[in-house]
């Protein structure tokens, strides 16, 4: 009898597991975590408001499909052209999914759809699952009712693959200024449609559409334990990718070969996509181009390499940067510039903890650097001035937040209040010598913990001797050389 009971319990679980795998649904977040996020959102918008979050459109051509960060954060659903309706009056959540597309499923595999109601409820925990076809006609007016609550929706661009909000803002501005284009961003078009299809002034109070972006930014700024685990894994993969690139460094190798070495490690460890395009820069001019991306230059003895590169691992990323010598040996001048960057980074990270502001930490690290300057005289006065300027200005010290995007939403809001556990950001101290066109930096991604800080990338070599040693090892580029040489 006991075995038969176990069978009846086991069979549905196995069927659910098979269904989940068949629908390609994420396994990192349970329904309880999504419910916690919805509850926080409800608390912010109030009990007399509703929210609508639009998912990503279909991928163009053979682009890798990827959901927008906010929609994935709230649902874990990757199906394109989906919508999430959160009703603060009832605290009920409805997801609208497209009807099942059998033709698409035959070509690309199954996705959650309006035909998988029970499965979606089990996986996501939503109260209702409906078809996007149900959103036609008077759906919006009927859903709002006679009292017409405020309607929240994101006003700011929603990030997708290898995208951050700042870069999207720039792209949208360029499109708007193009006299032969001028398309409105998708989120702006949605706002216009909501106003057009909502209640009219003559038959109900006018619909007030409000910005949900700041609320989502605040929610995403504090990472859960599961989110931290994904960023930790993304950081590990990024670090080992950079290690493989450093091992592969030789004079005569091309920047794109180092890029390939790192990307090989990313793919080998389950990262499907890049978190952002690779910065693999060699030589003064390329390094001094902050977001250099061409990666076509041949490495030359005497140059430094800057690699800043990390994957997108299950919708979470890291941010990491290291510099090393092409020929395996730092010059005395390079050491004199890089040592203060490393020491400043260490002093900053050691002092990160909850309950203090970044300004307090900057002051504490600056005091520690004063002692270091006293004990470590410079041979080059210009370099000393550059190092002191870095500390005085806090250049790059507390950089951008990191999470689902490399420059995560929320801008630099974490610096405006005492630090809290779960805040993730990059520490990127930067030294500049404009007279010599020099720009040097090291970058790590950290999380504030209840006891202090965790540096996700502290396993990666950063001390100069250790970096030199890495470049003397054989890398994948030497083990698997290019198939053919580019013709001269």
Feature locations, PLM:
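Active-site neighborhoods and metal-handling regions in enzymes and metal-associated proteins
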Residues: 2, 20-488
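Bacterial N-terminal signal peptides that target proteins for export
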Residues: 1-9
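Bacterial N-terminal signal peptides
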Residues: 8-17
